[in-house]
């Protein structure tokens, strides 16, 4: 391993100006790859590792070319042992490195829970902030690609419930690039959940102009009747549903892309609900105690007198993630969302 003096990570170093300082059309896979490349070029302490990330470039080719460019000391393969991957990351961070480990699929993350919950999330608090833990855990996540068991899941609620972690979910290539750059520059551990279904969606990425950092939501579509709060894969679903709602029913939906699940930008949500008076939360995971449950509870606790109707949730079912042939029936889609919209609009 390359010998680098022990010292805590400095965010300003890992968020240096991009090496490829241009605006261009990229897929999400390309945007994440570019973010990793630029972060590694900006700071020699940034290390990328995981199952098949070096020789194969990852199962989705997200890390392709990094080992060739930066060498086997900085981009390397690991055994098929997720707990070990996170344990290695914690140890490297303690020695002054900036690790970016990959868990190959969200359904493979469960063996790593002990290392994540007991050590990764707690080290900064355990040391009263004296030790940084600049670890960004990349996890291809969520459904929509017809994958086998363990290859599609919604793990975000586990991570959000683990105090000490930041949790982000990009929905566009631009967000994928900049949220990853911000995550790598952060002294706290960040769970970076990549929506697999959006991997090949294309968009403009400006690597010279930072987009909003972790903790900031974005209003993707303005509206006046109902606030739809969502993230990841379902942002595009919400936007297309909003078009349908306007064309067929003359309903005006405002769509908020959370981007950051923890910390949460509640101010943006509250400002929207002040205008609309109604809210639907949409996410892929099961309904019971899913991410939307806590968010809906907070909205109703803090904005009860601004609401014209109860907050509803359009989400997955309380079953294990289904086999590929049933996935489309299980995942929330336009029909489930618009049913919730109609129900909140029925309220007087």
Swiss-Prot record:
Its cofactor is thiamine diphosphate. One of its GO terms (biological process) is branched-chain amino acid catabolic process. GO terms for cellular component: peptidoglycan-based cell wall; plasma membrane. Keywords: Oxidoreductase, Thiamine pyrophosphate. The gene is bkdB. It is an enzyme of class 1 (oxidoreductase). Heteromer of E1 alpha (BkdA) and beta (BkdB) subunits. Part of the BCKADH complex, consisting of multiple copies of BkdA/BkdB (E1), BkdC (E2) and Lpd (E3). Thiamine diphosphate binds at residues 51, 80-82, 104, 108-111. It comes from Mycobacterium tuberculosis (strain ATCC 25618 / H37Rv). The active site is at residue 151. GO terms for molecular function: 3-methyl-2-oxobutanoate dehydrogenase (2-methylpropanoyl-transferring) activity; magnesium ion binding. Its EC number is 1.2.4.4. It comes from the Bacteria. This is 3-methyl-2-oxobutanoate dehydrogenase subunit beta. It catalyses: N(6)-[(R)-lipoyl]-L-lysyl-[protein] + 3-methyl-2-oxobutanoate + H(+) = N(6)-[(R)-S(8)-2-methylpropanoyldihydrolipoyl]-L-lysyl-[protein] + CO2. Induction: Up-regulated upon nutrient starvation. Is also highly up-regulated in a DlaT-deficient strain. Part of the bkdABC operon. Component of the branched-chain alpha-ketoacid dehydrogenase (BCKADH) complex, that catalyzes the overall conversion of branched-chain alpha-ketoacids to acyl-CoA and CO(2). Substrate binds at residues 105-108, 151. InterPro entries: THDP-binding (IPR029061), Transketo_C/PFOR_II (IPR009014), Transketolase-like_Pyr-bd (IPR005475), Transketolase_C (IPR033248). CDD domains: TPP_PYR_E1-PDHc-beta_like.
